[in-house]
Amino acid sequence: MRASRFFISTLKEAPSDAEIVSHKLMMRAGMIKRLGSGIYTYMPIGLRVIRKVEAIVREEMNRAHAIELLMPLVQPAELWQETGRWDKMGPELMRVKDRHGREYAIQPTSEEVVTDVVRSEIKSYRQLPLNFYHIQTKFRDERRPRFGLMRGREFTMKDAYSFDRDAEGLKRSYQIMFDAYVKIFNRFGLQFRAVAADNGAIGGSGSHEFHVIADTGEDAIVYCPTSDYAANMEAAEAIAPAVPRAAATQTLTKTATPGKAKCEDVAALLNLPLAQTVKSIVLTVEKEDKGVVSKEIWLLLLRGDHELNEVKAAKIPGLTDYRFANEAEIVEWFGTPPGYLGPINTKKPVKVVVDRTVAAMSDFVCGANEVDFHFTGVNWGRDLPEAMVLDLRNVVEGDPSPDGKGVLAIQRGIEVGHVFQLGTAYSEKMKATYLDENGKPQLIQMGCYGIGVTRIVGAAIEQNFDDRGIIWPAALAPFEVVLCPMGYDRSESVKTETDKLYEALLAAGVDVILDDRGERPGAMFADWELIGAPHRIVIGERGLKEGALEYKGRRDADATAVALDDMLAFVQARLAA
């Protein structure tokens, strides 16, 4: 590739709406161009990176015996209505009508379509197992698109779907795809971690997320440095305290706490550690019976320094469709506004669930259900009955690891892949069956496996950059090598030797670009450091007189002089390293 016949358009400054490093550098390097909110044109340099991501993904999917197809972007509403996701997904699912009034979804994912394909094509157990995948544009109408390709509305993903006879077959397919993902991310040259995760709205049971490690990541990754335990924050278990509950030493006392509605303020007023306080979180569940709507109020108790894990709360039987109670509901059930709530003397009966840590507390502080008052010296069994005890909270650094092999640490990550064991969540709703050896219909066991192709591009930058620009891992760079001739259009010797090296690199299969734009050296070097070419070779008259060229790796502090005749072998060795 010659730069004069390619399109390169760099910026000295990032647009004001670019917030994170990857967004800024992609805009400055001319990789993407904003068309609308969360919608980007992939410019030539950006598209080259995307194609390299796709190529690696495709190779490993094929190696794992997945079969490529391509499902439509626009999908009939009827399929989504079969699974209930037409209504369940809410406004992030883009819905459109054609000229005949028929409704369609602009797909954010393709479980319904692939299940429809399989239920019409798979008849016998002899046709299983099967794995289809595609690499396709998706659209999710994000409430707040931001961070460039990290959270856009239109993006590219690889989706694979496995189909098996039974749960054991699904586990085998799942492991094959899990292993393929590990190979993919290793080939990308990224630091990543696979973590246990919650299935969320997609359904099924059992899943893992793949996160690229980055300080700017939106997700908290929980892991144990001394074992293999890893989970995302939603799925990480906070185990019960190992020590038994201490005996009560204080009497129950109603204590004035004027104007102190937060646990932190109450603890400071009473000169107590925050961990001695208990916070009250009120949830509402609405139930309808024969057109009559009734409300059920739940009170969740957590230690004052802990945070509620909303995913864990939603898994409590009866709380699947909860919402946070409003102030009117709180006053009706507790007799006081938020800030002074507690489990003792509620105005109306509530269902109480206690976090494991709170269940082990004694002599604790909680709201007295009266403005400007809290109870101190509260103890289970004596002052209030023992309640349902569950894991309700987010873990914190230093918590014991659930596997008993150390303590937990937390780092930030960017989710770029997710694998799910769906089971029969979709095949049951869509009646996707096969006939077993006895001619009896059986539900197909499904798995689904996604990789965010365009998100990987942004995540790779978040992990690999400096103050000059992008530092691409070799596998993802738009070009492996850039040739930077000094005076290409003025010096015959520079032009001749540059062209010879260029042709030799091309013949050796190297992805090389020759910068023949005639830019000044400083501007040319700045462009390629910004774009992130891993290997730069400078050809100048002075060096040629000495029989040498200048080589500099993108991560190198200094340039290296290399003999002209040795440069091809030198570059090949660096590429293979």
Swiss-Prot record:
Keyword flag DNA repair: no
EC assignment: 6.1.1.15
Reactions catalysed, as given in the entry: tRNA(Pro) + L-proline + ATP = L-prolyl-tRNA(Pro) + AMP + diphosphate
Highest taxon, organism lineage: Bacteria
UniProt subcellular location: Cytoplasm
Pfam families, alphabetized: HGTP_anticodon, tRNA-synt_2b, tRNA_edit
GO process terms (BP): prolyl-tRNA aminoacylation
InterPro entries tied to this protein: aa-tRNA-synt_IIb (IPR002314), aa-tRNA-synth_II (IPR006195), aa-tRNA-synth_II/BPL/LPL (IPR045864), Anticodon-bd (IPR004154), Anticodon-bd_dom_sf (IPR036621), Pro-tRNA-ligase_IIa (IPR002316), Pro-tRNA-synth_IIa_bac-type (IPR004500), Pro-tRNA-Synthase_IIa_type1 (IPR023717)
The entry's keywords: Aminoacyl-tRNA synthetase, ATP-binding, Cytoplasm, Ligase, Nucleotide-binding, Protein biosynthesis
Function noted in UniProt: Catalyzes the attachment of proline to tRNA(Pro) in a two-step reaction: proline is first activated by ATP to form Pro-AMP and then transferred to the acceptor end of tRNA(Pro). As ProRS can inadvertently accommodate and process non-cognate amino acids such as alanine and cysteine, to avoid such errors it has two additional distinct editing activities against alanine. One activity is designated as 'pretransfer' editing and involves the tRNA(Pro)-independent hydrolysis of activated Ala-AMP.
Subunit architecture: Homodimer.
Gene3D superfamilies reported for this sequence: Anticodon-binding domain, Bira Bifunctional Protein, Domain 2, YbaK/aminoacyl-tRNA synthetase-associated domain
Domain remark in the UniProt entry: Consists of three domains: the N-terminal catalytic domain, the editing domain and the C-terminal anticodon-binding domain.
Name of the protein this chain belongs to: Proline--tRNA ligase
GO MF entries: aminoacyl-tRNA deacylase activity; ATP binding; proline-tRNA ligase activity
GO-annotated cellular components: cytosol
Protein family (similarity comment): Belongs to the class-II aminoacyl-tRNA synthetase family. ProS type 1 subfamily.
